[in-house]
Amino acid sequence: MTRLMCLLMSLSIFVRGFDSQFVDMSPASNASECLESQVDAAAFSKLVWPYPIDPAKVDGIIYPLGRTYSNITLEYTGLFPLQGDLGMQYLYSVSHAVGNDGDPTKAYISNYSLLVNDFDNGFVVRIGAAANSTGTIVISPSVNTKIKKAYPAFILGSSLTNTSAGKPLYANYSLTIIPDGCGTVLHAFYCILKPRTGNRCPSGSDYNAYFIYETIHSDCQSTINRNASLNSFKSFFDLVNCTFFNSWDITADETKEWFGITQDTQGVHLHSSRKGDLYGGNMFRFATLPVYEGIKYYTVIPRSFRSKANKREAWAAFYVYKLHQLTYLLDFSVDGYIRRAIDCGHDDLSQLHCSYTSFEVDTGVYSVSSYEASATGTFIEQPNVTECDFSPMLTGVAPQVYNFKRLVFSNCNYNLTKLLSLFAVDEFSCNGISPDAIARGCYSTLTVDYFAYPLSMKSYIRPGSAGNIPLYNYKQSFANPTCRVMASVPDNVTITKPGAYGYISKCSRLTGVNQDIETPLYINPGEYSICRDFAPLGFSEDGQVFKRTLTQFEGGGLLIGVGTRVPMTANLEMGFVISVQYGTGTDSVCPMLDLGDSLTITNRLGKCVDYSLYGVTGRGVFQNCTAVGVKQQRFVYDSFDNLVGYYSDDGNYYCVRPCVSVPVSVIYDKSTNLHATLFGSVACEHVTTMMSQFSRLTQSNLRRRDSNTPLQTAVGCVIGLSNNSLVVSDCKLPLGQSLCAVPPVSMFRSYSASQFQLAVLNYTSPIVVTPINSSGFTAAIPTNFSFSLTQEYIETSIQKVTVDCKQYVCNGFTRCEKLLVEYGQFCSKINQALHGANLRQDESVYSLYSNIKTTSTQTLEYGLNGDFNLTLLQVPQIGGSSYRSAIEDLLFDKVTIADPGYMQGYDDCMKQGPQSARDLICAQYVSGYKVLPPLYDPNMEAAYTSSLLGSIAGAGWTAGLSSFAAIPFAQSMFYRLNGVGITQQVLSENQKLIANKFNQALGAMQTGFTTSNLAFSKVQDAVNANAQALSKLASELSNTFGAISSSISDILARLDTVEQDAQIDRLINGRLTSLNAFVSQQLVRSETAARSAQLASDKVNECVKSQSKRNGFCGSGTHIVSFVVNAPNGFYFFHVGYVPTNYTNVTAAYGLCNHNNPPLCIAPIDGYFITNQTTTYSVDTEWYYTGSSFFKPEPITQANSRYVSSDVKFEKLENNLPPPLLENSTDVDFKDELEEFFKNVTSHGPNFAEISKINTTLLDLSDEMAILQEVVKQLNDSYIDLKELGNYTYYNKWPWYIWLGFIAGLVALLLCVFFLLCCTGCGTSCLGKMKCKNCCDSYEEYDVEKIHVH
């Protein structure tokens, strides 16, 4: 059990010598020379066994001092090694041995004593990592043996010197830590190491290296030599003036352990894992050494084990890891020990765990920090003018304090350091600025007040003093940053000192008849006393009085002053008050600097640089731009007081943009433990230093990334992601813009990879399914409807916002971030709250899409199942019997007239016989009147004309009896006039329909435009809400919250450390309050959007995919169909329905019961029972059923009622219940309205692309909504709609002579064609009976004269 316990006990040994201040380190070594050594660094360095720091195994972690934790995970900032650090490997070896007897005469070591390392924050040591295993002996690489643990030895100091050969040695006091007693003792002493002069010693000849050694066979046997290594060290150095010597016992074992050394103002601290957690790795402080001088360097002392040749052993390497100020995530077990840890600055995955203070992170996309480009240079522009002339301060007689002199400088360069170096400064105090900042800033003016003043009275001039100096002589103004310098003037400065110091001790005005009323006249800050105008330049005696009588114009009275004289000192003593005023312009006062090439901006365009422009400092990117603003004003600012443009001295206008700073997200898959990094909304070409990204969380650069091949996507630059053109329908890692990260273990079995793959989300359109009846209940039942279209916008998500808390509050300034630590886990809670809101968004959107997504789509006619007649929606089929052919239209005259409704019957009757004889027989009846069409064809004209003429001609021959032949003509005229009258009546009725129907249409249009206005207004509010919130948050950055400036850079540049903390703390408080309000608003909006997303899902499923029975849920009135399209941050619905326009009031009951015992009751289904509209109740009252959405009484049947239990609200009936009849259909046919609506409607599903990029541009739909409002106004002034009369087309057949002429013409045409084709041409015979003889004449022959060619 002893080996399992912490046995490192404090056995501090203090040995006092002759001097009480020092301890006695005797005996000194009596060796005349130092042991010989062979330094073979190559042999030690070629053996490499890497042991990187693994925080998961608690490597190198020093337990927090003075506190403990149990069963908790937290972030802790302190001194830790870097995760993955390989450290420096050191190895000890055995010595040379001649034989098996005697001591080896030569040590075999590496060159460790020649290497000096920076101590910085300290280091930790891994000891015995390979103990108990088999390894190589360095001196004999071919021999393997069991490895033993070896403790390291160190020298630590603050100053160095060299030997004559140029080898480093420690000077002055040094802390030496030496293991001894064969691993059972640890010595620590603080002495001056004086090199010994013997042979092979540091100050002697043939010096090679110093080291320590033990002789195994003699020092490590039954009696352990506790000082063997110490004595060997004394052979190289004499230990002089040692202030302490401590020793600690160690249990000898081969257990691996950790050892650490740190330093602070309390001294040097030693830490060990043996004290409290021997096998766990937690290091606890076990000693604090009184070493207060800052340690700068350390050296590993070589160590050699002298052994016999046949008993050599291998010694485990130890590893030294530097400590850094880091943030670690620590996991404390129930017993209080650290069992897991993560270096928050190691990589993006580590940062993810630390951002959410958890070792277990679920699969998702997380916002963790921000990437900010580092400055690559400096650009300075300031007046290139002469040096400010301070010579008046250095010549002449120094003025008295009441007659101080003032110098105001502008348009010059000052050297305040050079000025103050001329004086012996006794006090330098500032207000609103630091002494260092006032000497290196640019100002619009610099003012210096100077005067002779004894340093013995400097307390009277300090702020808050109420003595005579601030009352009557000089009062420092604090309106602007100011510094006060009290100094004495050396003899080599030419300024002349006055005979004595003097000041005004009294300045009053005497008034009254006897001048007995005295009024003190005090001065204002920075102003002269009124008594100064008539006071002497110096007072000849102490208490000297001086007066001046005021004129009547000045108000009368007497001014009286008293002067006090102070003896002059040996050297003139003076006071200087320096005040500066901030501003910008070409006449600024700037320090004299060696600018080098910082004046050139041309080679820095497009790069992130630190700039100082006439006193305006910052960091940004300069680009050539089109000039804006007033050139004389030089600087162009935005509404948040940020510099956006600058007119340079080279004549160009440069835009100033912030350096790249973008949010960084980590894509993490828990099942594979893989991650990728997303730089939001930035091109990869702008992220030039991504491999050394600065982490606001850890205040350091992230040191590792697994991939250096970034992939450009629509959402930003991603590393750790490859693009294989995948398409998925389900995504657990949405990136936005319809992009998804797919882990290596994907849904595709044939696919595997070692990193994430980029995929595109593919959503299908929702389908239209069978509609169901609408439902509702109202006392007034609709009897007529109008067609309405309602538009509705539902916000389903808000833009994801991630605010880097530290970046927002501190803008990257380390001083601010250190103060922010005092606010605890506030920033972590902010990040967690925003991430929670973003996860809530992802969950609600994913749930929404999952609920509304369908796997297939159908056309309209297949999607609308049931008793729907969709023939009206189809293209009419040409060729039916109801259509005339094209030949008939060509051969007959066609006349189309208005048809009041009887033309078709008349036409069918006329086809049954001769039309001229059946005209009167085919007369039609309309409302009791016989009617005929108002048209005659030629046959009927001939018949009626012949009848009329015959009756007239024969009237004289037949004594009027032939007049009866005119009766058919008269009847024909009467019936046709009746037809004209009936047509006029129908036209009159249609005029009424025109007014009524179009008025209804206009009402629906007005309602539609009104809902469009409301919907657009909601879209505008939803889109602008995020931009307005971000603008408000950004505007708070310009709020000073009571500090001297809203810029931390200005505060750091102007104030000292104490004042910086107070001013920055005000900004932190204010900005955290603003950020907290913003986060609270985001959480509320996120929850509201999530609830709205559920509502949108319900509406898609109930309104778009089916017909809703809820009145008013899917638009106004009775729902018919709805459509949805994508809109910013939500869905835009178009609901189509019927809105009642007329109602009838009926007497209704909730149910009906008889008087049986128990009573038998029935209740209506989707309607209610109504009476027969009688005015009184009686036994014979008849009850009917009507639907609640349309008034149409019908008998009570099994289809419209059901049996229920009795209820007091049901109507009691005296008679028996009517027996239910068979089902009676009461469907209402809306095919006309459906035809008009579906005629030009195209429905498709929305593109469910996630909107991830924050848009701070405000959406303004006011103009569009104003236009819609004007349309509504104009619709109120115009009404028209037409109901078209039925058309009748009449074909009039041609008479016989027209047909005869038509046939003759055709015969003539055919003969002409025949003779042209068959009876023309030479030798042609027509039908073999005609022959052409001389129809082809031959041509005459001519003699042709021959032509001879010579």
UniProtKB/Swiss-Prot annotation:
Membrane side Extracellular: residue ranges: 13-1295
UniProt entry keywords in alphabetical sequence: Coiled coil, Disulfide bond, Fusion of virus membrane with host endosomal membrane, Fusion of virus membrane with host membrane, Glycoprotein, Host cell membrane, Host membrane, Host-virus interaction, Lipoprotein, Membrane, Palmitate, Signal, Transmembrane, Transmembrane helix, Viral attachment to host cell, Viral envelope protein, Viral penetration into host cytoplasm, Virion, Virulence, Virus entry into host cell
Coiled-coil stretches noted in the UniProt entry, renumbered to this chain: 1020-1064, 1257-1285
Protein source organism: Bat coronavirus 133/2005 (BtCoV)
Record's subcellular location: Virion membrane; Host endoplasmic reticulum-Golgi intermediate compartment membrane; Host cell membrane
GO terms of biological process kind: endocytosis involved in viral entry into host cell; fusion of virus membrane with host endosome membrane; fusion of virus membrane with host plasma membrane; receptor-mediated virion attachment to host cell
Record-linked PROSITE patterns: BCOV_S1_CTD, BCOV_S1_NTD, COV_S2_HR1, COV_S2_HR2
Segments for region (Heptad repeat 1): 991-1041
Protein name (record): Spike glycoprotein
